[in-house]
Curated annotation (Swiss-Prot):
It comes from the Archaea. This is DNA-directed RNA polymerase subunit Rpo1N. The gene is rpo1N. Belongs to the RNA polymerase beta' chain family. Zn(2+) 3 binds at R573, C575, C580, H582. GO terms for biological process: DNA-templated transcription. SUPFAM superfamilies: beta and beta-prime subunits of DNA dependent RNA-polymerase.
Amino acid sequence: MSEKNIKGIKFGILSPDEIRKMSVTAIITPDVYDEDGTPIEGSVMDPRLGVIEPGQKCPTCGNTLGNCPGHFGHIELVRPVIHVGLVKHIYEFLKATCRRCGRVKISEDEIEKYSRIYNAIKKRWPSAARRLTEYVKKTAMKAQVCPHCNEKQYKIKLEKPYNFYEERKEGVAKLTPSDIRERLEKIPDSDVEILGYDPTTSRPEWMILTVLPVPPITIRPSIMIESGIRAEDDLTHKLVDIVRINERLKESIDAGAPQLIIEDLWDLLQYHVATYFDNEIPGLPPSKHRSGRPLRTLAQRLKGKEGRFRGNLSGKRVDFSSRTVISPDPNISIDEVGVPEIIAKTLTVPERITPWNIEKLRQFVINGPDKWPGANYVIRPDGRRIDLRYVKDRKELASTLAPGYIIERHLIDGDIVLFNRQPSLHRISMMAHRVRVLKGLTFRLNLLVCPPYNADFDGDEMNLHVPQSEEAIAEAKEIMLVHKNIITPRYGGPIIGAAQDYISGAYLLTVKTTLLTKEEAQQILGVADVKIDLGEPAILAPREYYTGKQVISAFLPKDFNFHGQANVSSGPRLCKNEDCPHDSYVVIKNGILLEGVFDKKAIGNQQPESILHWLIKEYSDEYGKWLMDNLFRVFIRFVELQGFTMRLEDVSLGDDVKKEIYNEIDRAKVEVDNLIQKYKNGELEPIPGRTLEESLENYILDTLDKLRSTAGDIASKYLDPFNFAYVMARTGARGSVLNITQMAAMLGQQSVRGERIKRGYMTRTLPHFKPYDISPEARGFIYSSFRTGLKPTELFFHAAGGREGLVDTAVRTSQSGYMQRRLINALSDLRAEYDGTVRSLYGEVVQVAYGDDGVFPMYSAHGKTVDVNRIFERVVGWKA
């Protein structure tokens, strides 16, 4: 056979002659099997259509199951029927061409002119050619009289799904498929071309079916159910219906049955052919099984998430993969993934024997499939595969191994694997990790790596894939390893970084009140794989003490400079320069942390232009990995030794504080009552562009918002700055000051759709309030805190506000998912060329420079091509 390169694919419509030529037999009988259960010749299960039973030979090609591709048959339709998928095109042809002569309803000169332009541009600029044909169609459809034969044109009406009518003088007449086919046959090839179709592959009359292709048995095999009964495929059921109605129609015509009966059968044939193509046509009842289940016909096999394209071509099930629940493990590297031994023994990596690894691989073969690290298969140089489960003397087999053999060995520590969590919304939802085989049944993941996967440990499952070829392993190692993706391509900041305990530990270690003896410093540094000389202690008498800042400085590069506010720098502890008594402004000079604390702004994940960001960007991602594997463990060790716990007293306020909050509540109530009274008296000043009612709502909301923030300020003022709940909120480790306000002081206004809760009963939200009551408590304002507990009415309003959040989340997820799919489909053909432009498949320029600046965010300084301030700070030690 000669080899040829595929240059392109062209789609068209099968002509009746082509259908007959590719068919091996006509299908004429609706009966499928005889009394013995043998397929009948001439039925939809005719043996000539392909083999589905093992051991049988195909009568057509002589091949057995697996090698026989299957063969088409055909059904000669007694009367033509409309192809339901091409109704739109048929409608356009009927409207754009003359009912008498079949010409396009534009003048000969125009046809000649447009044909010339169309032929010149169709290959080079297909989108422009498409616009031209659309223009020709629209112009032709408007013509009332044919410019070629002067025939008056009647309006064509389509009644979906497939009924065409013509509005004549004498009334509305239905166009049968035969009438339509006659008209379409009259259209000359030159006119077909100018309407945007290729007459060699898509003649318009072929859209009206006279012959129906019957697909091979191989794509619609019958299956045996447990009871021994043979169950046919949905397509086979549909084809039997078509053959049965076709035969009945033929018999009725031959017997000279009344026209009404013939038309009914013709309509029924049209219905069965339409639902054979698509069983979800709007306005057409779906074809069903006896059980009431709709049949899955051709269109259903192709479209949708489970269809052929998305379900089997874009996305496939794969080998060498596993899935299980994930658990946290702060003791493994960010680059590692803990793999259960049972999975490591099931998934294999092919390793070729060389003189250097032969002894190691011999031992794996001796260990066999049940002992880790072992091997499952041996592949000989001749390609024969030996399954070690069935080898009795594995030692003997191991002794025969030689270079050239391939051993499919178990996963071992250090192997490269791909790790993924669905939904995979961006590139770093799939990254490469090194294997660390551990006891247990779950995958272990370092907590720092959760953000790119959007993973948590409340039952999430993740997928692990094992690359099989050296090329795939090398690619994963060089491009996909976790530490090479710490900086996200989304905004050029670190997506992997500290969260929760890490931030709390870093803050408690760096705060200026933390002093450590040499033993304590050694104990917390013991978890890091480093040799560090802390130098002279900061405090020499009465006892020698190191500060937490000294411990952290030991991990920083000696030429690193940084200035910036910490997360705790807000409210009464706000500092904007080095002269800060609150330790909330960070200063690092020549790698020494002189003042300030490490919190979310310094080392947190998803914090661009932070200390962590500049350390990774300026000193390599390898250094970033080392820092996270060592310094971050020190933070966790410190918080373990120090103790970090939250108790009820952390959100309990004293009586004097409560009294202060109650006074504010009384003041706000009076203010709201005054506003309501002013509204009733007509004295309220409306806000420009708002009605009086909307203005009142705005005034009330402003008053209540002020009340909640005042209550929060009062509570914060009296909370101990080392109260751990407050530490979490201020450092950015978890929660916010608002959460503490809600726990300690009050919940505040509950809203639905951005407004106070106003729906419920006819004139009030709940039966506990008077009709037309618009006071704060009657419209969802909660004066209680979580600490004191909610009243029954308050609990109801809180549930209403919470419900909206749940619904909103569910709706947003589906909408954003669909939007992303559409974006991916639209942008998938665009690429950045070597000249820096972004172009489509046809070479059309979409952007002159990628992103208008030609900068990839991952390698930018948080979006900026060059950050001059940072360069100054790095080199000189202060910002420009």
